[in-house]
Amino acid sequence: MVKIENAHEGVIHHAALNYYGTRLATCSSDKTVKIFEINDVNNSSSLLETLVGHEGPVWYADWCHPSLGENLLATCGYDGKVLIWKESGHGGKMQIIGKHAVHSASVNCVKWAPHEYGLILLCGSADGKISVVELKDGQIASTKILDNAHKFGVNSISWAPLMKTDSSDDGDETTAVKQFISGGNDNLVKIWKFDDDQETYVVADTLEGHKDAVTAVDWSPTTLLQSYVASVSNDKQCLVWTQDHSSKKNDWKKISVNEGKFEQKLGSVSWSLSGNLLAVSDDDKNVTIWKESGDGKWEEVVN
C-alpha cells in the first residue's frame, strides 16, 4: 500500500488513478490539481507537478484510456469550467489543450467514454445540464448540450461499457450503442442512449426509487446476461438496478443493498473492474464492500 501525504492547502474532493496506476491526480478546494507518480515496487510516491487553471474548488478528475492519449486528463470545478490537460512529451509538464466553458454553474463531474468510441467527454453540471464533448486531433470538435437533464443539478454520471445490439431483423448485424447514466438533485436516476435519427442523446429510462438527492451513480463494467447500475443518495440508500438482456421488456428492476439500513448519507459508489464487487462510502468516512449472493441479495464482505 502506498501512502500519500496531503500536499494541498485545502480539502481534497477526489482522487483518480490513471489506467496503469502509475499517476494519481488529486483535486482540492485550493483550486489546484496535483499529479503524483506512484511506485508500487517500493511503495512510494512523489509529487510531479501542480496544475493551476481553475478559478475555484476543483471537484473531479478523470484520466483518458492510454490508447487515445498518454496521460490525458480532464478536470472540472466550481468555476463552471472543464479543462483538458495533456503531457507535453515524455516526462514533460501537463499543459491545457482544451477549455470547455458552456455551463452557467459548477461542473460537478466529468467522465471519458469507453475508448472504443473515441475521445468523448461527458460533463454534468449544477445548472441541470449535461454536455457531451468530442475531441479530434487534440481539439474540441463538437459539443452536445442536454438541457434540463436534472432539475436542481447533476451530481454524477457514468458511461455504460461497450455493448452491441442487433441492428437487423435476422440478427446478423450488430451496432454499438452509446449509453450513460446520470443522477441528480431531483432524486432521479436516468438512462441515456444515443439516438441516430436525432443525432443526440435521449432519455431511455427514468429510474425512481430514491427519496433525496442522488449523489453518485456507477455502471458496472460487466456485459454478460444483465446490466448492473448502482446509485446512492442522501436518503441513506444504495440501490442496484438490473436489466435482463434476454428480456424483450428491458425493464429495470431494483434491490436495496443492506435493506436500507445505512446510518449515514451515502456519497460514493463504485464497481470493481470485474463488476462483482460494489464499494459504498458514507459521509462518516466508512467504506463497505458488497457482493451479490446466489439468491440475488447483496452481502457485506468487507467493512
Curated annotation (Swiss-Prot):
Tell me the SMART domains matching this sequence: WD40
Name the PROSITE patterns for this protein.
Answer: WD_REPEATS_2 (PS50082), WD_REPEATS_REGION (PS50294)
Query: What are the GO BP annotations of this UniProt entry?
Result: COPII-coated vesicle budding; mRNA transport; positive regulation of TOR signaling; protein exit from endoplasmic reticulum; protein import into nucleus
Q: How does it sit in the membrane?
A: Peripheral membrane protein
Domain of life, per the record? Eukaryota
Disulfide-bonded cysteine pairs: these are: none
Kindly list the places in or outside the cell where this protein is found, as annotated in its UniProt entry.
Cytoplasmic vesicle, COPII-coated vesicle membrane; Endoplasmic reticulum membrane; Nucleus, Nuclear pore complex
**Keyword presence, Secreted:** no
Residue windows of the WD repeats = 7-46, 53-95, 102-143, 149-202, 209-251, 261-300
UniProt keywords, alphabetically: Cytoplasmic vesicle, Endoplasmic reticulum, ER-Golgi transport, Membrane, mRNA transport, Nuclear pore complex, Nucleus, Protein transport, Repeat, Translocation, Transport, WD repeat
Identify the Pfam families for this entry. WD40
Main location group: membrane
According to the UniProt entry, its GO molecular function terms are: structural molecule activity
- Cross-referenced InterPro entries: Sec13/Seh1_fam, WD40/YVTN_repeat-like_dom_sf, WD40_repeat_dom_sf, WD40_rpt
One GO CC term of this entry?
Answer: endoplasmic reticulum membrane
State its role.
Component of the coat protein complex II (COPII) which promotes the formation of transport vesicles from the endoplasmic reticulum (ER). The coat has two main functions, the physical deformation of the endoplasmic reticulum membrane into vesicles and the selection of cargo molecules. It also functions as a component of the nuclear pore complex (NPC). NPC components, collectively referred to as nucleoporins (NUPs), can play the role of both NPC structural components and of docking or interaction partners for transiently associated nuclear transport factors.
Family designation:
Belongs to the WD repeat SEC13 family.
What subunit structure does UniProt give? Answer: The COPII coat is composed of at least 5 proteins: the SEC23/24 complex, the SEC13/31 complex, and the protein SAR1. Component of the nuclear pore complex (NPC). NPC constitutes the exclusive means of nucleocytoplasmic transport. NPCs allow the passive diffusion of ions and small molecules and the active, nuclear transport receptor-mediated bidirectional transport of macromolecules such as proteins, RNAs, ribonucleoparticles (RNPs), and ribosomal subunits across the nuclear envelope. Due to its 8-fold rotational symmetry, all subunits are present with 8 copies or multiples thereof.
Q: Return the protein name.
A: Protein transport protein SEC13-2
What is the protein's species of origin? Candida glabrata (strain ATCC 2001 / BCRC 20586 / JCM 3761 / NBRC 0622 / NRRL Y-65 / CBS 138) (Yeast)
Q: Gene name on record? A: SEC132
